[in-house]
């Protein structure tokens, strides 16, 4: 099949007939509709399939209705359909179209899978939480001396002991009663200094002064103390 040619050169006067006329065993006249598209060498085999499927007269009428600049594409389509029909008499070129459509669907599925996989690779992965380097370094070098010192609470003990000490101090500041008030002789005159010390301790811890005896009863008080 030839996509170009000069009809006059394929006519009976200038050379051999075109492939279509050669197959039909007729004289190729000037202006043959098949001469530009079916050469004398390989055109006869291609035109044989076209003639068997569509018929030479039908193809001639079809090409006359097609614009001249679109005739080469029309001849290619006619030849392809004729050869497909010879290979598959039932479906013809439809089987080839279905096969191509299945390939398209398969390729689209593969493309979608690859695009989804590529999208997952482009998404930023969440970073695991990491301890700052400065914090980790300080934790590793941490020692007892680095721990914050907690100062113990300062308790004012004076508030606890002040009442007791003040009362003791007040009692100590009170003038001691002399020994002659109780009719007790001095330690130099008495050998029992322990009784006097016990009496003094009782007076200090008791916090009360014994009633002073009247001048008339000094002897009785002294006698009571001596009995004790």
Curated annotation (Swiss-Prot):
GO terms for biological process: organ boundary specification between lateral organs and the meristem; xylem development. Pfam families: LOB (PF03195). Residues 188-228 are annotated as: Disordered. It comes from the Eukaryota. Expressed in roots, stems, leaves and flowers. Expressed in vascular tissues of hypocotyls, leaves, roots, developing floral organs and siliques. Residues 16-118 form the LOB domain. PROSITE patterns: LOB. Belongs to the LOB domain-containing protein family. PANTHER family: LOB DOMAIN CONTAINING PROTEIN, LOB DOMAIN-CONTAINING PROTEIN 30. Involved in the positive regulation of tracheary element (TE) differentiation. Involved in a positive feedback loop that maintains or promotes NAC030/VND7 expression that regulates TE differentiation-related genes. This is LOB domain-containing protein 30. It comes from Arabidopsis thaliana. The gene is LBD30.
């Amino acid at each position: 099949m030839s996509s170009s040619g000069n009809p006059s050169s394929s006519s009976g006067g200038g050379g051999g007939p075109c492939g279509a006329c050669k197959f039909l065993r007729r004289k190729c006249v000037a202006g043959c509709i098949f001469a530009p598209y079916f050469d004398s060498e390989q055109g006869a085999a291609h035109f044989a399939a076209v003639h068997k499927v569509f018929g030479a007269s039908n193809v001639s009428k079809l090409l006359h209705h097609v614009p001249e600049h679109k005739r080469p594409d029309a001849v290619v389509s006619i030849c392809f359909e004729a050869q497909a029909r010879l290979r598959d008499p039932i479906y013809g070129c439809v089987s080839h179209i279905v096969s191509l459509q299945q390939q398209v669907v398969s390729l689209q599925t593969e493309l979608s899978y690859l695009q989804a996989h590529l999208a997952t690779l482009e998404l930023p992965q969440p970073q695991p939480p990491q301890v700052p380097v400065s914090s980790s370094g300080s934790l590793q070098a941490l020692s007892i001396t680095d721990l914050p010192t907690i100062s113990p609470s300062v308790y004012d003990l004076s508030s606890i002991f002040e009442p007791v000490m003040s009362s003791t101090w007040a009692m100590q500041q009170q003038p001691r009663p002399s020994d002659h008030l109780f009719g007790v002789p001095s330690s130099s005159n008495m050998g029992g200094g322990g009784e006097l010390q016990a009496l003094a301790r009782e007076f200090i811890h008791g916090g009360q002064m014994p009633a002073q005896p009247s001048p008339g009863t000094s002897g009785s008080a002294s006698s009571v103390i001596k009995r004790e």
